[in-house]
Every structure is written in C-alpha cells, then in structure tokens.
A protein has these predicted regions:
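Compact nucleic-acid interaction/catalytic patches
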Residues: 27-30, 34-70
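Short, charged beta-turn/beta-strand-edge "cap" motif at the junction between a beta-strand
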Residues: 20-24
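C-terminal terminal-subdomain/extension
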Residues: 7, 70-119
Length: 119
C-alpha cells in the first residue's frame, strides 16, 4: 500500500464516505455506510468494503433493508443489496462515531451471504 491511512476502518464501523463519482442510478454524494471488510483488508489494500445507509423509502426492496438508529446522528436503513469497495483516502472515509449493533450487522452479513450464494 502506498498511501498512509490515518483512520483504518474496522468491520461494523459506521462511516461517512463520498460515493461520487457515480453513474446511472448509483448513490451520489456523501453518505453514511457500514463497513463490511476487516481492518486487515484495508491495511493491505487501502480499500474498504461498505454497504450504504439510506433513507430510500420508495425502494421496492426495502423489506430487505436493516434499520439503523444511533445516538450520533445516523439513522435510516443499511441497504445490504448494495456493497461497494472504495479507496479509504480517495473517498475521504471518516469514522461517524459508532458501530452498527451486533444483531443488525449479523442481518446485513446474512443477506450478503445469501446474495453471493445465489446461482
């Protein structure tokens, strides 16, 4: 890894991340997200895997979303149907002040596992 990363995201952290640039109907702008990847992955690659936190109440697949309520200003739903890998430095990843609770994180990871095992 060539760039020095001051903050190394930990799995389950809630972070702020820049989703720009984006194309089509992809999420745009700076949004909260939950970290899916382990910190060792970030140390090795400089990348972080995340699922966005959204307020997308009109999404037809919302029943698969996982509710997020915090005492540090992040609320909405984790969309486990979307997962992205981004550069920690280029996407200006910042710790949001807490983690996703264990049961909600388990639901997100279970949905990911189910999605990746569809064939």
């Amino acid at each position: 890894m060539t760039k020095n990363i001051e903050y190394v995201p930990e799995q389950q952290d809630l972070v702020w991340i820049d989703f720009q640039p984006s194309k089509g109907n992809e999420l745009r702008g700076r949004h909260p997200a939950v970290v899916l990847s382990a910190s060792g992955y970030t140390r090795m690659t400089g990348l972080v895997a995340v699922s966005p936190v959204t307020h997308g109440i009109n999404n037809r697949l919302k029943e698969m979303f996982v509710p997020v309520i915090t005492n540090f200003g992040i609320d909405g739903y984790v969309n486990p149907l979307q997962f992205h890998t981004f550069s920690v430095v280029s996407r200006n990843v910042e710790y949001a002040g807490g983690i996703l609770d264990d049961s909600a994180f388990a639901m997100v990871m279970k949905t990911h596992q189910q999605l990746l095992n569809i064939y």
